[in-house]
Amino acid sequence: MVMAKAEKKSVSHHRYPQVIKQTPRGTAIANIALFRFLNRDLFGNLDNLYRTVIQTSGPLVLHFHVLHSYWLNLADIVTFCEKVKAQKPDVTLVWTLHDHWSVTGRCAFTDGCEGWKSGCQKCPTLSNYPPVRVDRAHQLIDGKRQRFRDMLRLGCQFISPSQHVAEAFNSVYGAGRCQIINNGIDLATEAILAQLSPVPLNPGKPRIAIVAHDLRYDGKTDQRLVHDMMALGEKIELHTFGKFSPFTGQNVVNHGFETDKRKLMSALNEMDALVFSSRVDNYPLILCEALSIGVPVIATHSEAAQEVLAKSGGQTFAATDVLRLAQRRKPEIAQAVFGTTLDAFRMRSRVAYSGQQMLEEYVSFYQNL
C-alpha cells in the first residue's frame, strides 16, 4: 500500500515495519516551493521500491492512495508502473481516489467549481488547495488525464469512497472505470467506540462540536457560520477540536488538536451534536466516527455530507437551519436530522459505518482481482 504523504515520520512508521517513508523532506519542500508556479509536482518517484516489487514472489497488489500535492511526480509514477508491469506481469495496480485531483488540472477539491468539465479554462480561485500564484491548470489538464488513461491501459483499477468522486472520474474516463467502496471506521477505532456507553442527556445548554485539522481554513470550517453560532451566546456551548482556533468567546471551549483517538471520541460522546460545514471533503471519516457513537451531525449542504448522512437516513441543511437546530437537545436533533428516535438513530448508524463492512467489501474486491 502506497501513500505518499510522508515528509516526516508518522506514528505508523514506528508501529508497522511495512510502512515506508517515501518522499524525503527536501523533495517535499522543493515541490511545495515550485508548485505555486508550475501547478504540478516536479520531483518524487517510487524507484527505490522497484527491486523489492519485482523480487517479490507470486502475485502482488500495489495499492495507491494519495500521491499528489507535493509528494510524487505523476509521470514518474506511470513510468514506474510501466516498468513493473513489463518485468512482473502478475502485479495488479489499484488506486483509491480520495478527492477530485484525477479529473482537474490542479485542484484536489473543487469547492463547487465545475470548470474541470470544460478543461479548466480559467480557475476562479488561486487559493483552492493546493494553492498557486500562477494558474496553469488549463495547460496541464490534458497531459494529466493522459497519465490516468495510461494507468487504465496498464489495468489499474480505481476505487473511491464517495459516489460523486467516482461519477466525476467515470464521466471523464468511461463508465464503470471507478468502483465505490464507502469509508468506514477502522477496526481499532471501532474497538474504542464499542467501549463508549451513551452518556446521560445533558441537562444544561446544548454542547455543539466543531472538528477540523486547521480551524482557520474556511473551506473546512465555515467561519461565518461559527461566528453566528458564537453570537447565540448563552443558548449553546461551542466546543472546537483542532489547531489554530480563531474562535474565542464566553460560550467557546477550545480543546486544541487531539491526537489520541480515544480521548477525542470520549469528548465527542459528551456532545449534543457535531456541526459540519466543510465544502472540500469527499467522504469525511469524522462524520462516520461521530455518527457511530450516536452523536447527531448537523451539516450544511455538500455532496460529501449528503452522501454520508444518507447512509443512515439523514439530511443536510441550510446555514440558517443549522443555527436553529444547534439550539436543540440531542433527541430533538436526531429526530430532525434522521427522522427517528435517538436510540434508533444510534443503532442504525453503528451498522451503516461499520469498519467490518468496509473490510469485507475490500476483501471481496481483492478476491475478484
Predicted feature residues:
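Conserved donor-binding/catalytic core segment of Leloir-type glycosyltransferases
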Residues: 199-220, 230
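Short hydrophobic beta-strand element within catalytic cores of glycosyltransferases
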Residues: 296-299
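Short alpha-helical segment that forms part of, or immediately flanks, the ligand-binding pocket
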Residues: 265, 287-292, 303-307
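Membrane-proximal helix-turn-helix segments that form the acceptor-binding/catalytic region
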Residues: 116-158
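A charged, aromatic-enriched C-terminal amphipathic alpha-helix characteristic of glycosyltransferases
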Residues: 196, 323, 337-368
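Carbohydrate-associated surface elements
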Residues: 164, 184
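Aromatic "clamp/platform" in nucleotide-sugar-dependent glycosyltransferases that forms part
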Residues: 279
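Conserved acidic donor-binding segment of nucleotide-sugar-dependent glycosyltransferases
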Residues: 311, 315-337
